[in-house]
Amino acid sequence: MINAQAFGMALFQLSEEEKKVKKVYDQSHDFLKLARNFKDGSLAALLNAYTLTKKEKLKLIDKLFKNHFCDLFVDFLKTIVLKGYFNLVEQALKYFFDCVENEKHVQFIRIITAFELSAPQLKRIVAAMEKKLNSKIVYKTEIDKSLISGIRIESSAQLFEKNIRDQLSRLMEQFKGN
């Protein structure tokens, strides 16, 4: 029986060999974000479909991802599709994240704000996260104007969120509950 860990470990080992761990790590997050934007898992359904030949699936992967992801990551996607296990891709990537973070004793995080942070602000946030996670932090910043104000910090295992969009969402849930 094939499991997601085997795919995740293979991706980790290859990315280490090619010295592309950070790049593949970032692209894996980008891919998961993209895949989750497809309605009702339609990307997974398409790449697992029996109506498409393997050759058609490989062409589709190239067309969708070749210009946006490194060859190593695209080849990973092709392999998992060729083996017929695209439904395991999310689990495989989560295992890959765990391998990277455990092996490198580092946590990769995304700091998402509604506006650009100053260097001192970033320094304070990173120091606080290193203390909270008891790990060295490597970060990537993103701007998401839909947050309105506040911050969202994502790691592979945790989410820290303090922003108006989240607060409004919780408030709406309370109203629906009444």
From Swiss-Prot:
Belongs to the ATPase delta chain family. This is ATP synthase subunit delta. F-type ATPases have 2 components, F(1) - the catalytic core - and F(0) - the membrane proton channel. F(1) has five subunits: alpha(3), beta(3), gamma(1), delta(1), epsilon(1). F(0) has three main subunits: a(1), b(2) and c(10-14). The alpha and beta chains form an alternating ring which encloses part of the gamma chain. F(1) is attached to F(0) by a central stalk formed by the gamma and epsilon chains, while a peripheral stalk is formed by the delta and b chains. It holds the Pfam family OSCP. Keywords: ATP synthesis, Cell membrane, CF(1), Hydrogen ion transport, Ion transport, Membrane, Transport. F(1)F(0) ATP synthase produces ATP from ADP in the presence of a proton or sodium gradient. F-type ATPases consist of two structural domains, F(1) containing the extramembraneous catalytic core and F(0) containing the membrane proton channel, linked together by a central stalk and a peripheral stalk. During catalysis, ATP synthesis in the catalytic domain of F(1) is coupled via a rotary mechanism of the central stalk subunits to proton translocation. This protein is part of the stalk that links CF(0) to CF(1). It either transmits conformational changes from CF(0) to CF(1) or is implicated in proton conduction. Its main location: membrane. One of its GO terms (cellular component) is plasma membrane. It is found in: Cell membrane. The lineage of its organism: Bacteria, Bacillati, Mycoplasmatota, Mycoplasmoidales, Mycoplasmoidaceae. It comes from the Bacteria. It is a peripheral membrane protein. InterPro entries: ATP_synth_OSCP/delta_N_sf, ATPase_OSCP/d_CS, ATPase_OSCP/dsu. One of its GO terms (molecular function) is proton-transporting ATP synthase activity, rotational mechanism.
